[in-house]
Structure formats: structure tokens, C-alpha cells
Amino acid sequence: MRQRSILALIAIVTLLNGCKSYNHILENIYDKDQSVREWTVGMASLSADEIAEYSNEMARTDSLNQTTVFDILDKEGWPSHLSDKANRAIWLVIDHSDASNRIKYLDLVKVKAEEGVLSKSDYAILKDRTLMENGLAQIYGTQIKMAATVIGEDITMQLYLWPVTDATALDSLRNTVGLSPIEEYLKTSSDAVGHVIVWDRTKTVEDF
């Protein structure tokens, strides 16, 4: 009896130490993911060479982060008892990877959102992104696309809300995953990027 109690205690301590280790690793990855993207806030004032340099640095950081996170997910699964920051780090690394990895881990993200480990909006964003990348209409209206507008000989670039599956039910769908009404989202996002984001309900995915 005493031996079993000792073994149980050892198992608990091992689990706690493992959680601390994963938290440390993943929280560090979160910090790297965010710090390497700080330059994008003032991107409009940067030269082409500076943008290229920062972009390369971001790609290198993302690659290293992906190697670590995907190794954990593929070998151990999604670790339990992580901090919110550590869980967020995993989602960010998935979101900032390539299309094939976003699809690969989409179902896992859905499960974690249903469990409350991630927010439902995290899943909604990733789901919409994978749909857009496959040329399909999005569900929750989280994705923006830049496209050329041609008027005569003039060509201008415009930001558009990627087409949605159900425009009339969009706000209701957004509400189910904790997202703000679409008009509020478009205004906030337009202010953030300094360009108006247009929702043209007549456009279909074929127009892009």
C-alpha cells in the first residue's frame, strides 16, 4: 500500500514537472512569435530592404517554433494543464504555419475549443482561413483578402471581406463563437490597418 502511494506521488511530481517544462518552452515560443511581428505595426514606413530583412527573420523564427511545437503535438499530443499563454502559443504557431499544417491540426484545434482550452473564436478563425485557402466561402467572416480593382486604365488595390456562406446569418454565426458583429469588426479592422475593408455582398470566390 505504502509503495503504491509513493509511486502515485512520483507520478504526480513527474506530471507537474512536465507541465512546468512545457509551459516554459511554449511561453518562450509565444514571446518569440509576437516579438518578431512587432515590425509589422510600422510596416508602411519601412523600405523594401527592411521589409525583406524582417520577413526573413520572421520566417526563420516561425520555422524553429513549428519544429518544436509540431514535435510535441505529434509525439505527445496536446499537453494538458498548460497556462493560457502556452495554449495560445500552440494556436499561434499552427496559425502562422503553412496551409497543410493548418488543415492537419484543424480538428485538434476544434476539440480544444470545445474543451475550453482555446476560445471558439480561435477555431473559427482557423476554419475560415482553411476554407479561404481552398477557394471556398468562409463561415464566420474573419478573413480579409486584397484584390485589384480596375477602373479604365487605373488599377487600385482594395481590401475585401472574403465571401461568406450565409450573409444574413453571419452575425448570428459570429455570436456563437464569441465574435463581434461584422460591421463592428470591419470598422475596428479598417482603423487598425489604416485602410477601409469593403464587404461587397455581390462578390463570390470566383471574383478573387
Regions found by a protein language model. Name each.
Residues 1-26:
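Bacterial Sec-dependent N-terminal signal peptides
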Residues 20-79, 87:
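Start-of-domain marker
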Residues 51-59, 91-97, 156-161:
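Second-shell loop/turn segments in exported
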Residues 73-145:
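Mature extracellular/secreted ectodomains of secretory-pathway proteins
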Residues 144, 183, 188-207:
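Catalytic cores of secreted/periplasmic lytic hydrolases that degrade extracellular macromolecules
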Residues 153-169:
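Short, 15-30-residue, compositionally biased linear elements
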